């Protein structure tokens, strides 16, 4: 114990925390501490196999070490510590704080030792009539026996009160950041031993059909704890390594490892692994570790060749486990959590009710199991932010309806995770160990019968679905050739045929029955409009029997046969005023069936066969009043249509939950950034903060000018560096749109900072007189490179922090792959479009484009024909009600790269020479999707593509185009592309110019060109370009 150093600051902080809880309980009625005025903690002789209870825990919590044969007495005024001389010199380090500490040293003289014990008993009696003790304390040894004798003689009138729960609530259960860090580390160490180490060992044993005892496999895992090399090199399932500051020497076992299989399961972990042979069926593994005195546990169920019943029950176990995790939060009552889980089991699968465990976990920390914090249906304790629990969900001894052998008749299922309670969903410290069915199921029986799958090319982890071979170190757009690799083209055609067949099969399976109503044209419903519920709600002016416009209720009250009749504005089509002599006429037209064939006139009616009044006409000599009424009706109609449209636009806007702010520490901040879409008011940079369940952008202009984005609403997170760009970007694509600023609806929120500063021209500056050459320009360039690199590092680091904070929602940082990008026109301007692992994006300038690849049903390349300089790309989504997405005017040089990108992303595509009417096509698809796939589905696109390719080959072999015809073709191609509404304005302008200008005769142009070519030695390419250049 020569190097023992007690942290006196931590000691005083924790003593203060404990005393504050004690005094607060006294003020509020002694509900927790039971009115005790002193507390005695005893530590006896250390056992060979120590069990950690609250007496050990108080030592570790306050001192960081365990001091055997030591007595601690806490009174409201003083802390007394009675120990040996050797230990006393270390305890002198904690003296001198807010709460006085008196260290009493015992020696070998029994009489002197008895006097010290009497001094302690006198302090207990002086403090009050109630003393707090640990009634279940099992401390043993001569020291304990001596104390009990003196205590029995001197404290006969003192009442003992069990303070186990008080110590748990006031000291151990809520952890500080240092304690939580130790628990996170011990949890990750548990994960590392379970997955990958135990999982790999178990898989190899089963794969090679070896016979091994449970105890032997457990010993392998047990001995791995001493392997320092393992701890330095092991990777967790999420490819992360353990913390660099991990000290393997401070790791120790608290549970197991326990391995169970073959129908014998004990989910209370009361026995070590037995000597039975590992049975390939249901296998349970559980283990627990201690790191820096803080414990964690984990347990997983692995299934080998499970039947449908076992898979179903495991999925249900996972659902119950997730339900419990969602219910655990700050303020929840323990028994309520268990009751909700129990009721869920009873309602969904009543046959499993009797197999459900009697508790769903317990508190953990310095104690490997806090007996005062058992998660059962009797515990009334309230969970608090900072508590750590082991959540255990299990079903024991379930009967197997289809046992494969005698050892498979009965099985159990269990999941155990160490978690931290927060104000929202808990943080699962052992969450890196997978729990889904695919990760925990192993199939060996059908392995030989399975068809061999073709070996996939190894892909870079950053690239994902994008083909790796498209990435080269020095490939520029200008260097891309348009020649086609025949082998690659053949391979791509074969792959595309497979994808097309797969899409057709999926479509037939998904839409096995007619879906005209579900996925077809939306059926409009008849809406009832009630202007007034009672007569007394009519406007007072109706007594005059005139036409009254009620703006408040959006109603026009008309006099009909001496009675006021209300008409809601939505029943009126329009109103008009006309003059005839001295009379003015007001005509009000109503909506009725059969008025038109346009989409706007498709108005639903309750009974279309009923009689309808189509119009009412009123006449008067007061023309000005009629003009005013007609104007008011038109304005009211316009406002109603606008309001209805706004309501429709906001239908998909989902109200987010509240952002839970971090209170106990400063949140991670990225300062001096702009947001897009921009907020109201002056454009000024704000800051982005990472909180518990989301991020917040705060404008410096006002505290109300802020944008909250929850992690649960984030679908994609992108970081785009400032290389080749003027700004560095963190871009968030949302699942559901949110409102920003003045009712701006958006699914994309972006934070950016400009990467370049304003440059000053210093020509003629005094400084330039004394500096020659370009040294200053070189320095400025170097400085800009450094600034850009620093900006990239800063934004990338912050994006990774966002992903880390939202890892429970599956958020990962994605970066665009610039080398695979291409130019195109998704909206009005020509932009550079780049693929990422999961998307195709353009986030440099608004409007932004984010297309998720997994949402795409098929892609179609339009205007792919000889002579055209560009083509269009159309994406059809799996949600057929969503309009297809067009990217126009892509240079033909990018055609092969786009095809390769689509093919490597497993997107079925086709091509054709013309632009298709996608509105009509999608209307056909949605009208009856079942029939659409029966008729061949998307095959009609592929058939057109194949026909075009055959025709093109025949044309190429039949004749050779000359220069003049090539010019004509290129002009006409520009004209053909003009009708696409989304084509670039530049292309349209060029086409119009070529139509309007008149050039020389073609024969004359050709003669002159040949003559000039002979004189200057130009090649064919320049010969073709010369006439066109002259016409421009």
UniProtKB/Swiss-Prot annotation:
User: What Gene Ontology terms describe what this protein does at the molecular function level?
Assistant: histone binding; histone chaperone activity; nucleosome binding
Subcellular compartments: Nucleus; Chromosome
Q: Does the keyword Methyltransferase apply?
A: no
- Which residues, by range, are in coiled-coil regions? 485-506, 624-658, 785-805, 949-1010
According to the UniProt record, which cysteines are disulfide-bonded? none
Residue ranges under compositional bias (Basic and acidic residues)? 476-508
Which Gene Ontology biological process is one annotated for this entry?
positive regulation of RNA polymerase II transcription preinitiation complex assembly
**Family matches, as Pfam families:** FACT-Spt16_Nlob, Peptidase_M24, PH_SPT16, Rttp106-like_middle, SPT16, SPT16_C
Looking at the record, which segments are called Disordered? 446-513, 943-1032
Keyword flag DNA repair: yes
Q: Where is this chain compositionally biased, Acidic residues type?
A: 944-979, 986-1004
Instruction: Provide GO CC annotations from the record.
Output: FACT complex
**Alphabetical list of SUPFAM superfamilies matching this protein:** Creatinase/aminopeptidase
What the record says about family reads: Belongs to the peptidase M24 family. SPT16 subfamily.
Subunit relationships: Forms a stable heterodimer with ctc-1/pob3. The dimer of ctc-1 and ctc-2 weakly associates with multiple molecules of nhp-1/nhp6 to form the FACT complex.
PANTHER family according to UniProt: CDC68 RELATED, FACT COMPLEX SUBUNIT SPT16
Protein name per Swiss-Prot or TrEMBL: FACT complex subunit ctc-2
What's the source species for this entry? Neurospora crassa (strain ATCC 24698 / 74-OR23-1A / CBS 708.71 / DSM 1257 / FGSC 987)
């Amino acid at each position: 114990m020569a190097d023992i150093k007690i942290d006196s600051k931590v000691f005083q902080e924790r003593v203060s925390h404990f005393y504050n809880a004690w005094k607060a309980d006294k003020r509020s009625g002694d509900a927790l501490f039971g009115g005790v005025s002193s507390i005695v903690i005893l530590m006896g002789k250390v056992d060979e196999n120590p069990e950690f209870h609250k007496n050990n825990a108080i030592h570790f919590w306050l001192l960081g070490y365990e001091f055997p044969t030591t007595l601690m007495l806490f009174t409201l005024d003083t802390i007394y510590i009675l120990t040996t001389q050797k230990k006393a010199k270390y305890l002198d380090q904690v003296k001198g704080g807010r709460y006085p500490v008196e260290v009493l040293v015992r020696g070998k003289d029994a009489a002197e030792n008895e006097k010290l014990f009497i001094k302690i008993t006198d302090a207990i009696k002086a403090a009050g009539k109630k003393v707090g003790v640990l009634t279940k304390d099992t401390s043993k040894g001569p020291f304990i026996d001596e104390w009990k004798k003196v205590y029995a003689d001197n404290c006969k009138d003192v009442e003992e009160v069990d303070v186990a729960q008080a110590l748990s609530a006031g000291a151990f259960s809520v952890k500080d950041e240092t304690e939580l860090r130790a628990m996170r580390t011990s949890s990750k160490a548990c994960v590392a031993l379970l997955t990958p180490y135990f999982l790999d060992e178990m898989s190899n044993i089963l794969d090679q059909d070896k016979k091994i005892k449970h105890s032997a496999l457990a010993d392998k895992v047990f001995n791995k704890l001493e392997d320092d090399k393992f701890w330095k090199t092991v990777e967790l399932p999420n490819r992360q390594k353990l913390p660099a500051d991990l000290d393997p020497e401070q790791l120790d076992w608290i549970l197991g490892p326990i391995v169970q299989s073959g129908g014998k399961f004990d989910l209370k972990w009361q026995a070590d692994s037995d000597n039975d042979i590992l049975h390939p069926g249901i296998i349970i593994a559980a283990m627990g570790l201690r790191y820096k005195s803080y414990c964690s546990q984990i347990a997983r169920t692995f299934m080998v060749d499970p039947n449908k019943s076992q898979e179903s029950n495991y999925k249900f176990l996972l659902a119950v486990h997730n339900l419990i995790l969602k219910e655990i939060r700050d303020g929840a009552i323990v028994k309520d959590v268990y009751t909700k889980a129990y009721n869920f089991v009873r309602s969904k699968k009543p046959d499993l009710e009797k197999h459900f465990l009697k508790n769903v976990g317990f508190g953990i920390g310095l104690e490997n199991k806090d007996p005062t914090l058992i998660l059962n249906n009797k515990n009334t304790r309230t969970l608090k932010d900072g508590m750590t629990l082991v959540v255990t969900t299990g079903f024991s001894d379930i009967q197997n309806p289809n046992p494969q052998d005698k050892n498979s008749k009965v099985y159990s299922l269990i999941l155990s995770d160490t978690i931290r309670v927060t104000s929202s969903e808990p943080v699962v410290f052992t969450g890196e160990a997978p729990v889904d069915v695919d990760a925990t199921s192993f199939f060996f029986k059908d392995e030989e019968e399975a068809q061999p799958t073709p070996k996939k090319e190894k892909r870079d982890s950053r690239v994902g679905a994008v083909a790796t071979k498209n990435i080269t170190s020095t490939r520029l757009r200008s260097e891309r050739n348009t020649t086609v690799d025949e082998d690659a083209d053949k391979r791509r055609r074969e792959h595309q045929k497979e994808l097309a067949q797969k899409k057709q099969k999926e479509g037939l399976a998904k839409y096995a029955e007619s879906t005209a109503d579900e996925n077809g044209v939306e059926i409009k419903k008849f809406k009832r409009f009630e202007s007034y519920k009672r007569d007394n709600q009519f406007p007072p002016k109706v007594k005059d029997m005139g036409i009254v416009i009620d703006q408040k209720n959006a109603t026009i009250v008309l006099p009909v046969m001496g009675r006021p009749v209300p008409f809601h504005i939505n029943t009126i089509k329009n109103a008009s005023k006309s003059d005839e002599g001295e009379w003015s006429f007001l005509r009000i037209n109503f909506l009725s069936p059969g008025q038109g064939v346009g989409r706007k006139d498709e108005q639903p009616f309750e009974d279309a066969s009923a009689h309808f009044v189509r119009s009412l006409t009123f006449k008067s000599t007061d023309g000005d009043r009629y003009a005013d009424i007609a104007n008011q009706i038109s304005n009211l109609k316009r406002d109603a249509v606008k309001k209805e449209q706004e309501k429709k636009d906001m239908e998909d806007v989902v109200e987010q939950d509240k952002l839970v702010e971090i209170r106990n520490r400063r949140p991670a901040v990225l300062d001096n950034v702009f947001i897009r879409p921009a907020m109201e008011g002056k454009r000024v940079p704000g800051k982005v903060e990472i909180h518990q369940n989301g991020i917040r952008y705060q404008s410096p202009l006002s505290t109300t000018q802020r944008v909250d984005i929850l992690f649960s609403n984030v679908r994609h997170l992108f970081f785009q560096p400032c290389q080749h760009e003027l700004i560095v970007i963190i871009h968030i694509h949302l699942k559901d749109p949110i409102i920003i600023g003045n009712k701006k609806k958006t699914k994309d929120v972006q934070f950016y900072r400009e990467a370049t500063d304003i440059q000053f021209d210093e020509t003629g500056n005094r400084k330039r007189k004394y500096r020659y050459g370009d040294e200053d320009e070189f320095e400025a360039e170097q400085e800009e490179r450094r600034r850009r690199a620093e900006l990239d590092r800063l934004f990338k680091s912050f994006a990774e922090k966002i992903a880390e904070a939202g890892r429970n929602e599956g958020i990962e940082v994605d970066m665009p792959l610039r080398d695979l990008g291409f130019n195109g026109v998704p909206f009005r301007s020509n932009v550079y479009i780049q693929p990422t692992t999961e998307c195709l994006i353009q986030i440099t300038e608004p409007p932004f484009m984010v297309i998720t690849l997994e949402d795409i049903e098929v892609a179609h390349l339009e205007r792919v024909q000889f002579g055209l300089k560009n083509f269009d790309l159309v994406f059809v989504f799996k949600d057929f009600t969503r309009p297809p997405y067009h990217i126009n005017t892509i240079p033909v040089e990018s055609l092969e790269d786009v095809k390769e990108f689509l093919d490597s992303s497993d997107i079925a595509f086709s091509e054709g020479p013309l632009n298709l009417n996608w509105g009509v096509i999608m209307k056909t698809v949605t009208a009856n999707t079942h029939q659409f796939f029966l008729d061949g589905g998307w095959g009609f696109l592929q058939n057109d593509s194949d026909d075009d390719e055959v025709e093109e080959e025949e044309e190429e072999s039949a004749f050779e185009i000359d220069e003049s015809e090539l010019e004509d073709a290129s002009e006409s191609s520009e004209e053909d592309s003009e009708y696409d509404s989304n084509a670039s304005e530049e292309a349209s302008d060029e086409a119009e110019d070529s139509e309007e200008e008149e050039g020389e005769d073609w024969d004359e142009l050709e003669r002159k060109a040949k003559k000039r070519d002979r004189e200057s030695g130009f090649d064919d390419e320049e010969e073709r370009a010369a006439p066109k250049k002259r016409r421009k």
